[in-house]
Amino acid sequence: MLSNARIIAAGCIAAGSLVAAGPCDIYSSGGTPCVAAHSTTRALFSAYTGPLYQVKRGSDGATTAISPLSSGVANAAAQDAFCAGTTCLITIIYDQSGRGNHLREAPPGGFSGPESNGYDNLASAIGAPVTLNGQKAYGVFVSPGTGYRNNAASGTAKGDAAEGMYAVLDGTHYNGACCFDYGNAETNSRDTGNGHMEAIYFGDSTVWGTGSGKGPWIMADLENGLFSGSSPGNNAGDPSISYRFVTAAIKGQPNQWAIRGGNAASGSLSTFYSGARPQVSGYNPMSKEGAIILGIGGDNSNGGQGTFYEGVMTSGYPSDATENSVQANIVAARYAVAPLTSGPALTVGSSISLRATTACCTTRYIAHSGSTVNTQVVSSSSATALKQQASWTVRAGLANNACFSFESQDTSGSYIRHSNFGLVLNANDGSKLFAEDATFCTQAGINGQGSSIRSWSYPTRYFRHYNNTLYIASNGGVHVFDATAAFNDDVSFVVSGGFA
């Protein structure tokens, strides 16, 4: 069996950019076919030519489906053309298995989401650019509050039935909140008891199980616990992950389950746990319900964050050899980082000022009054203090150096950050949260002028001036500053040399 796996793997690698067999072809050959297959980056069957995902644009609410090119990689250029001059959200992630197990905006459950009627947020269509074999594609960047779900899935494991699953994730994008998951969950979006889930979890939560080091870890969300092994506590064999692209795999059958993982860009999978179910009531036998979740917990806990590129769920318990062949296929796809910024270039270390382009406000610049970030009328004849308040030093992004952070010229060590969706000026406290809140990515101005500046950690949200105060705003949403009227103008700023 292992020799066959090596043959399959070699074929995948030799095929280069046009992979002969996709992950689901490999699972099928191993006798554990995919019953759900989701990816915004590529086809997961060699013969799949249908839609990968759907995007909806903010300008007119129109939608379009993004399909793979002949290489199997998503047609990112079609998305870029459709979304030009506006914003786009990922509304559907299509199931490639033929079972119709598509993922859509998650409804409320035990926890409500931040959108109208308690629904979760949808992901930005541009928050997670990557390349596969040099071809651009977009992943699914899940900010807290974002989630997708299908509570009426077909063919997924129920009860104690055997299943497997894997996901390719961003190993650098995570948090300790509950719960960035992909996999099998409750059908009513509520916690129905121990053993009613079986999903991949990625993050550094320490509320339930843990692995070695400080995390993040690949664990299993089995409901009412994140498990790293048979104990509800620590499994020293479950390592902290530091790969940019990570393959995470979970599989389970009666009184047997496993955690496997590895670098999605090179090398093989390792087994972090393989053995009996947790020695806690409710997990042997399992009571899986068969819904599918992405980015959230089974009860719609939506505080987690992470990035998803591809993943599947299978019928039956895949062999290690089959999973090893799938890993070789993933490595052959050659995931790599892509630029997070576009439009007018910024130079780290330079001083800049940012002028509004909305017709009302073209003499106003982004400035601060104490900790409040606002717009003020500034000119070359303004007082020195005001010119300093309206000048910002460009720094490499504190959370991601492919983007930027903006340090105050007159308050050294203080940066623009978002807090409760408002922009404020705070001293850098060195925390992971501060770094993420203070990291922003530039793109060509949505209204055609200058630059628009989106939050790295909430890429649906942009610097916006609203009643002269600065927010991170989405193009339509539940907050007054998310209003669609004048959005494109309000989020576009002309960058110039700093006043000071």
Swiss-Prot record:
CDD domains: beta-trefoil_ABD_ABFB (cd23399). Residues 1-21 form the signal peptide. It is an enzyme of class 3 (hydrolase). Its EC number is 3.2.1.55, 3.2.1.37. Keywords: Carbohydrate metabolism, Glycoprotein, Glycosidase, Hydrolase, Multifunctional enzyme, Polysaccharide degradation, Signal, Xylan degradation. One of its GO terms (biological process) is xylan catabolic process. InterPro entries: A-L-arabinofuranosidase_B_cat, ABFB, AbfB_ABD, AbfB_ABD_sf, ConA-like_dom_sf. Pfam families: AbfB (PF05270), ArabFuran-catal (PF09206). It catalyses: Hydrolysis of terminal non-reducing alpha-L-arabinofuranoside residues in alpha-L-arabinosides; Hydrolysis of (1->4)-beta-D-xylans, to remove successive D-xylose residues from the non-reducing termini. GO terms for molecular function: alpha-L-arabinofuranosidase activity; xylan 1,4-beta-xylosidase activity. Glycans are attached at N467. It comes from the Eukaryota. Belongs to the glycosyl hydrolase 54 family. This is Arabinofuranosidase/B-xylosidase. It comes from Trichoderma koningii (Hypocrea koningii). The lineage of its organism: Eukaryota, Fungi, Dikarya, Ascomycota, Pezizomycotina.
